[in-house]
Amino acid sequence: MKFENLLIEIGTEELPPKALRTLAESFQANFSEELTKAELPFESIEWYAAPRRLALYVKGLATAQEDKVVEKRGPAVQSAFDADGNPTKAAEGWARGNGITVAEAERLATDKGEWLVYRANVAGEPTSVLVPAMTQRALDKLPIPKPMRWGSNSTQFIRPVHTVTLLLGSELIAGEVLGIQSDRTIRGHRFMGESSFSLDHADNYLAALKERGKVIADYQARKALIKADAEKAAAVIGGNADIEESLLEEVASLVEWPVVLTAHFEEKFLAVPAEALVYTMKGDQKYFPVFSNDGKLLPNFIFVANIESKDPAQIIAGNEKVVRPRLADAEFFFNTDKKHTLASRLASLETVVFQKQLGTLKDRAERISALAGFIAGQIGASSEDAARAGLLSKCDLMTNMVMEFTDTQGTMGMHYARLDGEAEAVAVALEEQYKPKFSGDSVPSAGVSCAVALAEKLDTLSGIFGIGQAPKGAADPFALRRAAIGVLRIIVENKLPLDLVDLIAKAVELHGSNLSNALAADEVLEFLMGRFRAWYQDKGISTDVILAVLARRPTRPADFDDRILAVSHFRTLEQAAALAAANKRVSNILAKVEGELPSSINDALLSEAAEKALAAKLAEVTPVIAPLFAAGNYQQALTELAALRESVDQFFEDVMVMADDQALRNNRLALLGNLRDQFLHVADISLLQ
């Protein structure tokens, strides 16, 4: 078998930058699947992507499929011939369909009888014949929500396609993909290098495109180059570039030949809160802000040009000119907003409807205020500060700055609160009310901030469930799943002594008569319990551990977490599997008992040595684990219970639980019930696999 390297390049108009990486990775996965289906072995497959191209490089690809013998089984010999030994119509039809006569068919003996069989030698197809159709199928399966047409044909793709190159080593694979006939043409940079050139070999793709076309097609290399050059540029001016991963990926998807440059803006703009300036630079202009070593924003930014200019100063000046009006707008909004206190904007919240059935933003702020004060009282934080922060929590939505730069909500509330002389805890809580904003984001840690962040999310959950708008399927327009995870994370990560039942009840109560769903509290609790499972699964916790804890329905998230950790640890113990199996056996036995289960153990009725030993061991360990349960030290309690394994095993080996003597039977059931109850203080261990 021969092997060669394959290059596939699809040359397009500018591709959507935020989708570029996903498109390339999907193309790679889809084509890899095609190769596997076609039984074409290969060594590796790499993807390349730039604004005007998607490419794959398959290393060590077989140049043809292997020849193989195809076995096609026909009817059973018994039904293939009649009583006179003549072929039946079924046998003749099968043979005709395979291009043979019944007499030419072979016979296959199996343990289920003898069958007619046709074995054919099928020659493998050359890879060059298969690649065009495989490429088309791989492209057809790309995640393209809105494909477009171009020209006069009916072909659809995410952007118009101009070139298709298929090279197997130095051989051009002839074929049509996306309505374009393949050739050797590779298009270079729009403004530098050769506008197009002919590629002689698949292995020369990256080098030729870089040297002749002035395009770095390797996405990862381009991204790494931008990051390294931006860090160097920031270091030159004594700072550190703020290189957010998502922005770096977007910038790498916008340029083919990255040139990193440093620009400057007037220092007067530094009087504006840094977050607003950073939002403008990152969100609108795709610039990297620069911070000093002590975390202060510097009057500089780093940007990436898509051209190597003879006069970079002109490009720098152009970018400085573009960003200046945006920074001036931020300065104007900030200075205008400062003329009014946050508290003075409370009345204007009455003009904005939060949700038709749930009232205005002012109604929402008042509910958050009351709920935050309630929560703060339970966690030892200032109820007064929490209530104040809750009341002001939505006031910055009415400021010019937040209306223009929406992502600064909360953050601008903090800055304006400080200018108004509000307590620092109040100001910080205004910023942290929306945390965590995304997976991996930090949670608030200060008591007042926790109270307000929890209140903000619980008000949303209780309200939306209360009007019957719970998430359905993948749809979640109110981001309730994120809110639920936020509630759980804040409580668990801060070890707050809060019970979900109490919090939800208070949140529902504060909505008053607005809620039409009488089951809102129960549904919110079930929803949060369901998010527990999703959250722990994302953290790599085994599903059976989660289900074991969920079976006990602990409604204090911090307590729930302690149980998860304890059961996860217990699962690693040598005795765990045997005790889980024993618990399952006990559970099945007790489930079959009709009527009320006996609860007290009569030592006088313990007749077998094994049941006496188990009862004694249980009596010995119970006073040890009782205070551990009370203190929530579940891990140590389960470790102590693990010592029962030997006694439990011996009990089931020697003792007949369902004895004919009812008194003996009830006493043994009481012993097993007592044993199971000890484990149930933590979780249903019988659910462990």
Swiss-Prot record:
Protein keywords: Aminoacyl-tRNA synthetase, ATP-binding, Cytoplasm, Ligase, Nucleotide-binding, Protein biosynthesis
- Which InterPro entries does the annotation name? DALR_anticod-bd, Gly-tRNA-synth_bsu, Gly-tRNA-synth_heterodimer
Q: What is its EC number?
A: 6.1.1.14
Q: What class of enzyme is it?
A: ligase
Tell me yes or no: is Ligase among this UniProt entry's keywords: yes
Name the predominant localization: cytoplasm
- An MF annotation (GO) of this entry: arginine-tRNA ligase activity
A GO cellular component annotated for this chain's UniProt record is: cytosol
The protein's location, in the record's own words, is: Cytoplasm
Reactions mediated catalytically: tRNA(Gly) + glycine + ATP = glycyl-tRNA(Gly) + AMP + diphosphate
Q: Name one Pfam family in it.
A: DALR_1
Which GO BP terms, alphabetically? arginyl-tRNA aminoacylation; glycyl-tRNA aminoacylation
Indicate yes or no for the key word ATP-binding.
yes
Which PANTHER family does UniProt cross-reference here?
GLYCINE--TRNA LIGASE, CHLOROPLASTIC_MITOCHONDRIAL 2, GLYCYL-TRNA SYNTHETASE
How this chain assembles, per its entry, is: Tetramer of two alpha and two beta subunits.
Family membership, please give it: Belongs to the class-II aminoacyl-tRNA synthetase family.
Q: What is this protein called?
A: Glycine--tRNA ligase beta subunit
Q: Which organism is it from?
A: Shewanella amazonensis (strain ATCC BAA-1098 / SB2B)
Q: What taxonomic lineage is listed for the species of origin? A: Bacteria, Pseudomonadati, Pseudomonadota, Gammaproteobacteria, Alteromonadales
Gene transcribed to yield this protein: glyS
